[in-house]
């Protein structure tokens, strides 16, 4: 039995100090640091990307809830929007 335990131990990788329950910072020591390569994208490209993402979210929200979040107004559809005053 001792021989079987020895082979199992040899097959298993060395125990690591970072487990799934440990925080992310515990594993950082073992990982090599990557150098930043390249530069940030141009501001126009970032703005175009974010504008497209924002309009996509607005379209999906309007289709789902028949409410235009850009104009902040209800649309015709399956829901009836009623103003509630607190």
From Swiss-Prot:
One of its GO terms (cellular component) is nucleus. Residues 1-15 have a biased composition (Low complexity). Transmembrane segments: none annotated. Keywords: Protein kinase inhibitor. The keyword Magnesium does not apply. Residues 1-23 are annotated as: Disordered. GO terms for biological process: regulation of cell cycle. Pfam families: CDI. One of its GO terms (molecular function) is cyclin-dependent protein serine/threonine kinase inhibitor activity. InterPro entries: CDI_dom (IPR003175), CDI_dom_sf (IPR044898), KRP (IPR044275). PANTHER family: CYCLIN-DEPENDENT KINASE INHIBITOR 4-RELATED. Belongs to the CDI family. ICK/KRP subfamily. This is Cyclin-dependent kinase inhibitor 6.
């Amino acid at each position: 039995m001792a021989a079987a335990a020895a082979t199992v131990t040899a097959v298993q990788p060395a125990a690591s100090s970072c487990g799934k329950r440990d925080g992310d910072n515990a594993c950082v020591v073992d990982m090599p640091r990557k150098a930043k390569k390249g530069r940030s994208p141009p501001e126009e490209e970032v703005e175009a990307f974010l504008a497209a993402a924002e309009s996509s979210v607005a379209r999906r929200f309007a289709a789902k809830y028949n409410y235009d979040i850009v104009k902040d107004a209800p649309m015709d559809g399956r829901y009836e929007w009623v103003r509630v005053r607190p």
